[in-house]
């Protein structure tokens, strides 16, 4: 269905995008390890853009890049693919499988029987430079690895798998991440690629990559689709418009801590309780028993996608006792119903953000192994009134799309004009006077993007401004997440509001940001690239931010208006005092009586501020400003009526730019 609300501007944007066409790559697979597994918190990615290089220009990159592989770096499984001879190939690993578990095992040299060492290789989280890291035992020594290093091991295996199939070295890749990954997670994914010996040309949002797999060959006009991506550890929903090779993300939402592993954990907890009821034994703290149970629960979950019940049986489960439980599909759904329902909230959110009604959606595309759960499919069918699309392989679609993006970047002419237009998931801005979140790039803005805005100083002779960069949806920075900060120094002495400080945000196609500030008077500038710092948002915080932004919208607006009114009054007083002392301007054109009247009005206003600035409502502050303006207006009017300002040299009283 054609989007009724698409504008001429959108058409122009697409036309420009085609001229600089860009796309998404796909899969990489590799089985890595059996045993003593280190579960990888894998990153899934956003990233594409309307900007980029056209196919002709991209052809020049073929010799430079070689084959650009596409990797779906998943929480539980990873997959790799490449564009070969005009078609996408999903590459099998050395076990003959097209998807590879995202696990890493650390084993002694020459050890053939890995199972005997499993109990000696548990991992625990430790702190390393203020960030979480993984501690394991390798050859009797304790080793500490960052999440990026462990992810790099999986990426390295994917790289080797592709090289074995292609018969040549691979140096460039497109890697996918969840659409709701924040800046730190995206940067960490790029870092992992670098550690693995890969130049990550593009970080791509998983739903966008999957949309390519779904819509690359569709030529029947514009359509709007929902990509519902429920994997092993993360969940994303994106609403896209597809039109003749242009894939435009209109909105995205999700939860980077929701997926199949959560469903498994619910069942495992239930089975452990049942075992305790029967035997009186608590096996929940025994890692070996819990590990066995988890594997059986995952198998049972898969079975319940096609059968109504299954058995979970483990001989010698704990302290010589066998485990024997029956799990029905109904019980599985009961244990996880709240989580299933939780996945519908982001669906509603993207429809709301994009201004699209659910009956305007042409198709619902299922991605991720957990979308095979019958209850999930039934809920989507009930909500949209149609069967979800099952035309693509949910395990391979993301890698497939990533491989296509890799082909475009490598200059594969068989792909024609494939253009990706993606968005940023959270609003970005800086703190201005009073702790206000001044938004420069709203969420769901098309990336790459660049936005500049002029700010000024908050005090006379202020020679330094602090630029604090935040992400989030609330009106006050204290309720949002600090990404980074830096100072611009050496500002020449001047009255408040006089210097012009230009702050620029640049968000690249990978969703990674650079912020700069420049004094337009001196030309001096400073900048910061927001990277993988501690203190970045957790997935839960991201979800909470969006929810709280709606819940507290009215309250936030009242606080914002109050601070805005306070700034307006303070700026008016400062500006009026400055003009009153200017003998060449207003101060030199007033008689003594009028000047004293204005001075007294200023004194009264300042006294009121000293007493009430912390407690007054926004309306009270606005009233005080109106009273001050009313006292001054008749006096300044006399000057103009008398022709004293005929030259028009006086600047009108104004509030200036937002203050830093």
Swiss-Prot record:
EC numbers: 3.6.4.10
Reaction(s) the record says it catalyses: ATP + H2O = ADP + phosphate + H(+)
Region spans: Substrate-binding (SBD): 404-504
Induction of the gene: Expression is increased in the absence of DNJ1.
Pfam families: HSP70
Name of the protein this chain belongs to: Endoplasmic reticulum chaperone BIP1
Location(s) in or outside the cell: Endoplasmic reticulum lumen
Keyword RNA-binding in record: no
Stored PROSITE patterns: ER_TARGET, HSP70_1, HSP70_2, HSP70_3
GO MF, one example: ATP hydrolysis activity
GO cellular component, one term: endoplasmic reticulum chaperone complex
Region spans: Nucleotide-binding (NBD): 131-285
């Amino acid at each position: 269905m054609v989007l009724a609300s698409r504008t001429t501007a959108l058409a122009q944007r697409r036309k420009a995008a085609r001229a600089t066409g860009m796309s998404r790559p796909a899969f990489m697979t590799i089985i890595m390890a059996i045993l003593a597994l280190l579960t990888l918190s894998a990153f899934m990615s956003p990233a594409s853009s309307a900007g980029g290089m056209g196919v002709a220009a991209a052809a020049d990159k073929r010799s430079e890049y070689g084959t650009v592989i596409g990797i779906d770096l998943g929480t539980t499984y990873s997959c790799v693919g490449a564009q070969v001879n005009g078609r996408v190939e999903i590459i099998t690993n050395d076990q003959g499988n097209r998807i590879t578990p995202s696990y890493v095992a650390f084993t002694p040299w020459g050890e053939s029987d890995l199972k005997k060492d499993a109990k000696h290789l548990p991992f625990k989280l430790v702190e390393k430079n203020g960030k979480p890291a993984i501690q394991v035992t390798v050859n009797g020594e304790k080793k500490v690895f960052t999440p990026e290093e462990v992810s790099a091991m999986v990426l390295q295996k994917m790289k080797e798998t592709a090289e074995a199939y292609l018969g040549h070295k691979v140096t460039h890749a497109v890697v996918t991440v969840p659409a709701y990954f924040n800046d730190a997670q995206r940067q960490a994914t790029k870092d992992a690629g670098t550690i693995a010996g890969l130049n990550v040309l593009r970080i791509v949002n998983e739903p966008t990559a999957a949309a390519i797999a779904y819509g690359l060959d569709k030529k029947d006009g514009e359509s709007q689709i929902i990509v519902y991506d429920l994997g092993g550890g993360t969940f994303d929903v994106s609403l896209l418009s597809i039109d003749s090779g242009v894939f435009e993300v209109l909105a995205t939402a999700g939860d980077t801590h929701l997926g199949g592993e959560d469903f498994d954990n619910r069942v495992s907890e239930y089975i452990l309780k049942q075992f305790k009821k029967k035997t009186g034994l608590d096996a929940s703290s025994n890692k070996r028993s819990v590990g066995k149970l988890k594997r059986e629960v995952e198998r049972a979950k898969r079975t319940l996608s096609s059968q109504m019940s299954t058995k979970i049986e483990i001989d010698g489960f704990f302290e010589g006792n066998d485990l024997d439980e029956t799990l029905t599909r109904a019980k599985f759904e009961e244990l996880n119903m709240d989580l299933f329902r939780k996945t519908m909230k982001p669906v509603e959110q993207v429809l709301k953000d994009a201004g699209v009604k659910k009956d305007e959606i042409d198709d619902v595309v299922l991605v991720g192994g957990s979308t095979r759960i019958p209850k999930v499919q039934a809920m989507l069918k009930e909500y949209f009134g149609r069967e979800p699309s099952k035309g693509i392989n949910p395990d391979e679609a993301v890698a497939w799309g990533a491989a296509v993006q890799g082909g475009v970047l490598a200059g594969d002419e068989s792909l024609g004009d494939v253009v990706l237009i993606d968005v940023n998931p959270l609003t970005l801005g800086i703190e201005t006077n009073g702790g206000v979140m001044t938004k420069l790039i709203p969420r769901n803005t098309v990336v790459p993007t660049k936005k500049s805005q002029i700010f000024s100083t908050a005090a006379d002779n202020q020679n330094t401004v602090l630029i604090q960069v935040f992400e989030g949806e609330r009106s006050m920075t204290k309720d949002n997440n600090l990404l980074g900060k830096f100072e611009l120094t050496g500002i020449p002495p001047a009255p408040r509001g006089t210097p012009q400080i230009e702050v620029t945000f640049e968000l690249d196609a990978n969703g990674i940001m650079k912020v700069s500030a420049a004094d337009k008077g001196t030309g001096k500038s400073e900048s910061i690239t927001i990277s993988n710092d501690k203190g970045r948002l957790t997935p839960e915080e991201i979800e909470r931010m969006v929810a709280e932004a709606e819940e507290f919208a009215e309250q936030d607006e009242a606080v914002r208006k109050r601070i805005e009114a306070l700034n307006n009054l303070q700026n008016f007083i400062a500006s009026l005092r400055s003009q009153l002392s200017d003998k060449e301007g207003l101060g030199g054109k007033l008689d003594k009586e009028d000047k004293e009247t204005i001075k007294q009005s200023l004194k009264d206003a300042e006294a009121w501020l000293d007493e009430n600035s912390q407690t007054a409502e926004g309306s009270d502050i606005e009233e005080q400003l109106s009273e001050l303006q009313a006292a001054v207006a008749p006096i300044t009017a006399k000057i103009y009526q008398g022709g004293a300002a005929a030259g028009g040299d006086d600047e009108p009283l104004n509030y200036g730019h937002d203050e830093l």
